[in-house]
Amino acid sequence: MARHVFLTGPPGVGKTTLIHKASEVLKSSGVPVDGFYTEEVRQGGRRIGFDVVTLSGTRGPLSRVGLEPPPGKRECRVGQYVVDLTSFEQLALPVLRNADCSSGPGQRVCVIDEIGKMELFSQLFIQAVRQTLSTPGTIILGTIPVPKGKPLALVEEIRNRKDVKVFNVTKENRNHLLPDIVTCVQSSRK
């Protein structure tokens, strides 16, 4: 049976919106939920990057157009976006570590939106995701990109795990998937 639930689909199809809605439904039913999501940053009608935002509301840059890497650090770039690894790790890693070491009755849900090219520049993030996948008592509700170009090792690893259910989000089904996603996460908690 699936323990972790991941959404996949093309950019802009509504994966993050579904993650938000599912998190709210789960929280309102008393499920402990923590994690982070990525959000587009726009300026003058143009996308200039992405922020990482924790469910507790802390926000920091994930990537920006034309960002200079810190002196002595290698540049991590996806298209026109330069990834701010330090900022990302400062926000995302504590959330994942909290999911790993949290005790208490019942299963916790850890939101990871997303496990994509930008996030995978961080070796510490890769290790933390693998750790969280194998932590009893933690269910991941996350997003992964659709396969395109060179496969991303961790994404393929997740996609092929027997304890993972992957929902393919499309414009046609996105308005009907929420109950299935919530039910799948809730049944993982039993």
From Swiss-Prot:
CDD domains: RecA-like_Thep1. InterPro entries: AAA+_ATPase (IPR003593), Nuc-triphosphatase_THEP1 (IPR004948), P-loop_NTPase (IPR027417). The modification N-acetylalanine is found at residue 2. The modification N6-acetyllysine is found at residue 165. Keywords: Acetylation, ATP-binding, Hydrolase, Nucleotide-binding. SUPFAM superfamilies: P-loop containing nucleoside triphosphate hydrolases (SSF52540). GO terms for cellular component: membrane; mitochondrion. Its EC number is 3.6.1.15. It catalyses: a ribonucleoside 5'-triphosphate + H2O = a ribonucleoside 5'-diphosphate + phosphate + H(+); 5-methyl-UTP + H2O = 5-methyl-UDP + phosphate + H(+); CTP + H2O = CDP + phosphate + H(+); ATP + H2O = ADP + phosphate + H(+). The keyword Hydrolase applies. Disulfide bonds: none annotated. Monomer. Belongs to the THEP1 NTPase family. Has nucleotide phosphatase activity towards ATP, GTP, CTP, TTP and UTP. Hydrolyzes nucleoside diphosphates with lower efficiency. NCBIfam families: PRK13695.1. This is Cancer-related nucleoside-triphosphatase. It comes from Homo sapiens (Human). The gene is NTPCR.
